[in-house]
Design a protein with these regions (language model features):
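Junction motif at the cytosolic side of a transmembrane helix
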Residues: 2-15, 19, 244-248, 255-279
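Aromatic- and glycine-rich beta-strand/loop motifs that create alpha-glucan
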Residues: 17-59
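Short alpha-helical transmembrane interface motifs in multi-pass membrane proteins
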Residues: 22-25, 48-52, 95-100, 131, ...
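Membrane-interfacial helix-loop-helix junctions in multi-pass membrane proteins
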Residues: 45, 76-77, 157, 208-265
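Hydrophobic alpha-helical transmembrane segments of multi-pass membrane transport proteins
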Residues: 62-67, 83-154, 174-175, 179, ...
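Transmembrane helix-loop junction
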Residues: 68-73, 108, 117, 121, ...
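Transmembrane helix segments
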Residues: 69-73, 184-230
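Alpha-helical transmembrane segments and their short interhelical loops
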Residues: 125-200, 248-272
């Protein structure tokens, strides 16, 4: 027996089912939320790999004690007199060198294909990059606090008071965040993590040591003092010293902030554009 199903005219002329379109646009609020989620991912990486905190925990303690007891007597005739010169310099040196890790870890993640997996997720593509930089701010804060604590243990008493120390710490963290955009660009465009680290250290070590972070700039040759006026780390060190020791707001602070804003304005778009081409 054959069953015949009648087809009504309405069914024959029914419009085909449409598949709803999904927008690829992600708003600013969602991008910010995704960035903080990726920053949290970066903090979880630190939790599961605590050895990555070596540079912001052991280094401030080791360098502060080492420089204080090795050079204190030679430069300032006593460790106590050397600490007002040393502690702000160590803070800048530790945090700025920590910013190099940003580029190195970005390159490692890209080599492992981590960002390739992010492409399949409904998140803002730039959130992986911005989240990594936000997570590093926690590292900068930890290094800053530890350096101050070690200095206090050694006998350093900042004449600028609590306010001067806090403002100096915030300035150093902000400036280092700005510098991290440079290393983010190097990390995204570099060919290997080792190469990124080598380039970064080759640039940062001379700039840090010639900035007067550990010795008075007045003892340097005239030509080196002249070069220092084009060294951004020099202004960071002087601004930190003036804030921590006198709570003074001078042109060094202005140049540090203006320079940091300029670095972000130039290198953040370049890093984002390079990342978007490769992510």
């Amino acid at each position: 027996m054959t069953t015949i199903t009648a087809t009504t005219p309405a069914a024959r002329h029914a419009a085909p089912a449409t598949i709803p379109e999904v927008s690829n646009h992600i708003g600013v609020a969602k991008t910010v939320a995704n960035s903080f989620t990726m920053a949290y991912r970066g903090l979880l990486k630190l939790k599961h790999n605590p050895e990555q905190l070596f540079d912001v925990t052991v280094q401030p303690i080791l360098f502060t004690a080492l420089f204080a007891y090795l050079f204190g007597g030679a430069i300032s005739h006593s460790v106590h007199d050397y600490l007002p010169l040393l502690i702000p310099g160590i803070m800048v040196q530790t945090v700025v060198l920590t910013s190099v890790v940003t580029g190195t870890q970005l390159r490692e993640d890209m080599d492992k294909g981590v960002f390739d997996r992010f492409k399949s997720l409904p998140i803002a593509r730039i959130s992986a990059l911005s989240g990594a930089l936000l997570a590093d701010v926690v590292r900068y804060t930890l290094a800053t606090v530890l350096t101050v604590v070690v200095g206090l243990i050694l006998g350093y008493r900042p004449e600028g008071g609590f306010a001067g120390v806090v403002v100096a710490g915030l300035v150093i963290i902000f400036c280092s965040f700005a510098v991290s955009w440079i290393w983010a660009l190097v990390g995204v465009t570099g060919k290997s993590a080792a190469g990124v680290q080598g380039i970064s250290m080759m640039i940062m070590f001379p700039l840090t040591f010639m900035s007067g972070a550990f010795v008075p700039v007045s003892t340097m040759p005239g030509w080196l003092q002249g070069i220092n006026h084009a060294n951004p780390i020099y202004y960071m060190v002087n601004a930190a010293r003036e804030l921590m020791n006198n709570n003074a707001y001078t042109s060094n602070l202005v140049w540090s902030l203006v320079g940091s804003v300029a670095v972000i304005a130039v290198f953040a778009p370049l890093a984002l554009r390079a990342y978007m081409r490769r992510a």
